[in-house]
Amino acid sequence: MQFHSSSALITPFKKDLSVDEAAYESLIKRQILQGMDACVPVGTTGESATLTHKEHMRCIEIAIETCKNTKTPSNSCMKVLAGVGSNATSESLSLAKFAQKIGADAILCVSPYYNRPTQQGLFEHYKTIAQSVEIPVMLYDVPSRTGVSIEVPTALKLFREVPNIKAIKEASGSLKRVTELHYYEKDFKIFSGEDSLNHSIMFSGGCGVISVTGNLMPNLISQMVNCALKQKYQQALEIQNKLFHLHQALFVETNPIPIKMAMHLAGLIENPSYRLPLVAPSKETIQLLEKTLQQYEVIA
């Protein structure tokens, strides 16, 4: 996985709640031009749980087409880490095969949500999906959403026994897990999935981030990651601290509710539309977002 900085892309909707493909393409181009290494379509932030199978595949397709046709400032192509998560292994497997077929560089697969599988069930789930493709696979541990954690021994076993499982997105909130994973397997790539811990995870052995805030501030997220990779940790910390209030504001309600509203307020998407059961943020949250964006000089 030859990338380090990436954003968990939002999925913009039109007023009729269909996917706004033109806006989606525009957002991806902005990521490319502002220095991100990769984009992550249809993950949690992309509201994958309320997309149809056809919409899910189309979003992956748009991301791949846009990255292929838009060069980065260094004249390369931004990588696509395609989200293929589902609580049905068969559906994740189908999405993984599709993503590989149309040119995804790697896939991100969240643990099955609601089912609450055992550790053996998680092992078989990930093994089955990974063995169906040849491209790299990133595990995704976010127990606050899935109801179950990929325990450290299970994650290590998957890395050791399944050749194309190369990385894990850590959104557990536990730095202890990060240090354990890095201690036992230095080549197991760890990506931060929690913006408030980006610097801490990078300092503890992480090699990159998958950021929600990066939708709005891709340039600063990219700069922070690049500083950390060069072991310029003080500079990275300064950027992390600069983003502190924005990170806080973007998670006062369930993700991606605040980030979509922030993107709308910043003029980056026309409609801050959500599919039920997600709803628009409260008046208080909108006021907080406006104040925060003014603080960062995103809006006047």
Swiss-Prot record:
Pfam families: DHDPS. The record marks T44, Y114 as: Part of a proton relay during catalysis. Keywords: Amino-acid biosynthesis, Cytoplasm, Diaminopimelate biosynthesis, Lyase, Lysine biosynthesis, Schiff base. Pyruvate binds at T45, I210. One of its GO terms (molecular function) is 4-hydroxy-tetrahydrodipicolinate synthase activity. PROSITE patterns: DHDPS_2 (PS00666). Catalyzes the condensation of (S)-aspartate-beta-semialdehyde [(S)-ASA] and pyruvate to 4-hydroxy-tetrahydrodipicolinate (HTPA). This is 4-hydroxy-tetrahydrodipicolinate synthase. It comes from Helicobacter pylori (strain HPAG1).
